[in-house]
Amino acid sequence: MDIGSGTGGTGLHARKHHKGSAHHQGEDTDDSHPQSPHRRRMTVILPSVVNAKNRKRRLDSIFETWGPNARAIYVVHNVSEFPQADQHALVSEKSQPEDPYSYPQILLVPPTIGIDDGLPRLNYVIRTVYEKVNPDFAFFVNDHTYVIPEHLCKYLEDKHPEEHMYHGHAMKNQKDVFNSGAAGYVLSRKTMQSLVQKWDQEDPTCLLKNGAKWLQGNPGLVTTKCLKEVLHVEAVDTRYHGKYHRFHAFPLTRIVSGAVDDWYKKKHEDMDKLMKTDKSYNNLDSGVGCCAQDTISFHYVGYLESRALFSTREALIENPHMTDHELKSLMIAKWPKDFKDIGGYSRGLPKEKSKDDWEPLLTVMRRISSRHTQREC
């Protein structure tokens, strides 16, 4: 996929032209930011704790779909997790990529940090991204997340890297507000720099050296506590027009149908009081009201669903006049059908004759596949 005119790199393989790119807008992406467009933002992909045995398939799928355009950096404990990157795209304690314009890259965690050491791993990753990659913004997700990088670029158009930023899908944990790691969250350069400074100072709120097992599995909660109590940086309402969510912790089919877990719904109750937003945040809309046109992420998206969602969006961007019948037929042809391929946390497409279920799904699919929301950065 093309990541912008004149950017200089060819990636791991010859990139496919991305139909949703700024070329449709006639934009010159080279002048969109005073720095190299390669450094405007990165997407950092941490290991998902769900269905770890299929991780390599998910990484391969991300590489073949949205990963290169998102400037994906895979966090790995061993280079064998994604051997395609090889040495030329390796970020580690002792090396940087020979070709900084090649994506995905891999960020190799040192052997002193184990697979279950979530806290030191997240700290190491944020530090390494800040010190060795130094993007304006970094979007932190895991390998079950599906990202629409052009929409992330659109969202960041009016944001500034030297201002604090902790943006994602805000939810509550008792009386604290945090951003879902599943839906992903964006940190600005200033915020990453401030976190690293607090770790270097061994601030007791920010640097938990012996965190409990539960916190090792949820390290973002410690980051949130540091951001709020020490740096005074809080999660914010990132919905479009204060109504439509951009970052989603469930896949498209479950978000549209409203078939999300009860725990997820409860984490939105009374959010208007905790985050000083309006009461509409307390309830998750389903159907056509579920998703912003510039939706940035979905979660629990398996490797086959990732390919299906990517190819469907590409087809709609290329041919926005596709009929509903054609779009429905395309989705049925592309989407995984067997439970083992869909995954336990996702859902398949509606039954073919279920008009009431298909209508909102087709509407949302069109909404998130508009040429008008595609940006490069």
PLM regions: where:
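Short, acidic, metal-binding catalytic loop of nucleotide-sugar glycosyltransferases
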Residues: 61-71
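Active-site-proximal specificity loops/subdomain of glycosyltransferases
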Residues: 79-135
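Short beta-strand/loop segment that forms part of the nucleotide-sugar
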Residues: 71-81
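C-terminal catalytic/acceptor-binding lobe
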Residues: 15, 214-377
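N-proximal low-complexity "stem/linker" segments adjacent to membrane-targeting elements
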Residues: 2-20, 24-54
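Short coil/turn segments at secondary-structure boundaries
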Residues: 58-63, 86-91, 99-103, 120-123, ...
